[in-house]
């Protein structure tokens, strides 16, 4: 009975090749004609993103991608016209142009001249020459878009958001990180507050507004009223929002992840608003909010006890706050308390006693912890990642680290030990 691999049906070969990484898929196709035919089966390339340097004409490039059913493309360098890509990939599903600094409104305008119904995701992050003009083209011809990444596109204004709100009603995820000109007016457009001009993107599930410095609590009011299906909201580094704005968010029952990292005006009062509402958060980040203290941990334990991930790095918390929190947070999986310099071994002992489901903990820069506290933490049954960062070990403690379980990663400055 023949047992050689060459006797396998092409369908079985294709299933095997599907487990290979992209480089090995290509190598397998070069072995023989039978393997080449099997390796070109569309199931082998399902979900693969082609990463391309567009430098010179290659007539076989796009027919080859289409033959394998590849519909996701990342352009690493763009020295040819973008229209070359669009014309070559008739059924393109995802186009990643992040970091293509030479892409202009003119180049994008020549590429998008008719409706592209198949395109679902477009990434223009750090395409710094893009302006509202390009968003007009996108809103007109890419009405099926579900994901739009505009992080670092610093020339976009509220007018661009009005165009998005007018044309992209199917949008589910929008990243506007560091779009410095955006204000409450633009967020109002997205949330459907100007229905006479645009319906809004009312189906949004993820919205990133990181480092949009002009936003105030009014934006949060717009979001709470219009974007009621939002599941993830990133407001990190938005210095213009305050505790009062969190009162608007506190009744968004669909919200699961809220990032308030480095929002300087957020205090214990804001956390109280969140905890007293009807939120069902699974992730909360208030790192570097230096007005957040032990009282916030009491509020979190009272009203946000369903959290799976909690980040409190550099917050003004102590062992007392840890004691208030851990007794109600038994489902917590990730706890980041790096640079919380008031935490001692007592806090770690409380964590080890009550948070048995923890898989990761960040203790970076916790200068008052010792070997005794670490030994308790490393006994957590589910722990996979322990970040010690800049914690200074004595020679004896470095030797003791060798006794830590090999089942999790110990990270210190410049190292990662498993």
Swiss-Prot record:
Gene3D superfamilies: Ribonuclease Inhibitor (3.80.10.10). Keywords: Cytoplasm, Leucine-rich repeat, Repeat, Ubl conjugation pathway. Residues 2-48 are annotated as: Required for down-regulation of SNAI1. Part of a SCF (SKP1-cullin-F-box) ubiquitin-protein ligase complex. Interacts with SKP1 and CUL1. Interacts with SNAI1; the interaction requires the phosphorylation of the two serine residues in the substrate destruction motif D-S-G-X(2,3,4)-S. Induction: Down-regulated by hypoxia. InterPro entries: F-box-like_dom_sf, F-box_dom, FBXL14_F-box, Leu-rich_rpt, Leu-rich_rpt_Cys-con_subtyp, LRR_dom_sf. SMART domains: LRR_CC. One of its GO terms (biological process) is ubiquitin-dependent protein catabolic process. This is F-box/LRR-repeat protein 14. It is found in: Cytoplasm. Substrate-recognition component of some SCF (SKP1-CUL1-F-box protein)-type E3 ubiquitin-protein ligase complexes. The SCF(FBXL14) complex acts by mediating ubiquitination and subsequent degradation of SNAI1. The lineage of its organism: Eukaryota, Metazoa, Chordata, Craniata, Vertebrata. Residues 2-48 form the F-box domain. GO terms for molecular function: ubiquitin-protein transferase activity. LRR repeats lie at residues 144-163, 170-191, 203-225, 229-250, 254-275. One of its GO terms (cellular component) is cytoplasm.
């Amino acid at each position: 009975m023949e047992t050689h691999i060459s006797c396998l049906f092409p369908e079985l070969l294709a299933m095997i090749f599907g487990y290979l990484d992209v480089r090995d898929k290509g190598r397998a196709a070069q072995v023989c004609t039978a393997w080449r035919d099997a390796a070109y089966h569309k199931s082998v390339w399902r979900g693969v993103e082609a990463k391309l340097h567009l430098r010179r004409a290659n007539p076989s490039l796009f027919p080859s991608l289409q033959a394998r059913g590849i519909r996701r493309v990342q352009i690493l360098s763009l020295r040819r016209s973008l229209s070359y890509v669009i014309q070559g990939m008739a059924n393109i599903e995802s186009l990643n142009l992040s970091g293509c600094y030479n892409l202009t409104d003119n180049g994008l305008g020549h590429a998008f001249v008719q409706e592209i119904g198949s395109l679902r995701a477009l990434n223009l992050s750090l395409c710094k020459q893009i302006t509202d003009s390009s968003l007009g083209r996108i809103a007109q011809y890419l009405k099926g878009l579900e994901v739009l990444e505009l992080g670092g596109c610093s020339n976009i204004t509220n007018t661009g958001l009005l165009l998005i709100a007018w044309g992209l009603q199917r949008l589910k995820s929008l990243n506007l990180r560091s779009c410095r000109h955006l204000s409450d007016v633009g967020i109002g457009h997205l949330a459907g507050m100007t229905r006479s001009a645009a319906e809004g993107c009312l189906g949004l599930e993820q919205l990133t507004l990181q480092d949009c410095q002009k936003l105030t609590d009014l934006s949060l009011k717009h979001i709470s009223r219009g974007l009621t299906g939002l599941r993830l909201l990133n407001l990190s580094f938005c210095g213009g929002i305050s505790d009062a704005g969190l009162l608007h968010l506190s009744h968004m029952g669909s919200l699961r992840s809220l990032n308030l990292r480095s929002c300087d005006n957020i205090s214990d009062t804001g956390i109280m608003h969140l905890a007293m509402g009807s939120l069902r958060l699974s992730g909360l980040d208030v790192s570097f909010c230096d007005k957040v203290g032990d009282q916030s941990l009491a509020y979190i334990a009272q009203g946000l006890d369903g959290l799976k991930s909690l980040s409190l790095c550099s917050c003004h918390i102590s062992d007392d706050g840890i004691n208030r929190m851990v007794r109600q947070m038994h489902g917590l999986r990730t706890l980041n308390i790096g640079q919380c310099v008031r935490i001692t071994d007592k806090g770690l002992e409380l964590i080890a006693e009550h948070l048995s489901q923890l898989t990761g903990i960040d203790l970076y820069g916790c200068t008052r912890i010792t070997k005794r506290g670490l030994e308790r933490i490393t006994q957590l049954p589910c722990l996979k990642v322990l970040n010690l960062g800049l914690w200074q070990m004595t020679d004896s403690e470095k030797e003791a680290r060798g006794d830590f379980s090999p089942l999790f990663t110990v990270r210190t400055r410049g190292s990662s030990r498993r």
